[in-house]
Amino acid sequence: MTILNNLPSIFVPLVGLVFPAIAMASLSLHVQKNKIF
């Protein structure tokens, strides 16, 4: 049960770092593809 109790403390920073990184990467690729600045 200790692993299940530690999951939120692992997922919160992981999601908080990975999701914005993916969003920024997809946004930059979208801007480069459309040549809109």
From Swiss-Prot:
GO terms for cellular component: chloroplast thylakoid membrane; photosystem I. Keywords: Chloroplast, Membrane, Photosynthesis, Photosystem I, Plastid, Thylakoid, Transmembrane, Transmembrane helix. SUPFAM superfamilies: Subunit VIII of photosystem I reaction centre, PsaI. The chain crosses the membrane at residues 7-27. It is a single-pass membrane protein. It is found in: Plastid, Chloroplast thylakoid membrane. GO terms for biological process: photosynthesis. InterPro entries: PSI_PsaI (IPR001302), PSI_PsaI_sf (IPR036357). Its main location: plastid. Pfam families: PSI_8. May help in the organization of the PsaL subunit. Belongs to the PsaI family. PANTHER family: PHOTOSYSTEM I REACTION CENTER SUBUNIT VIII (PTHR35775:SF2), PTHR35775. HAMAP family: PSI_PsaI. This is Photosystem I reaction center subunit VIII. It comes from Populus alba.
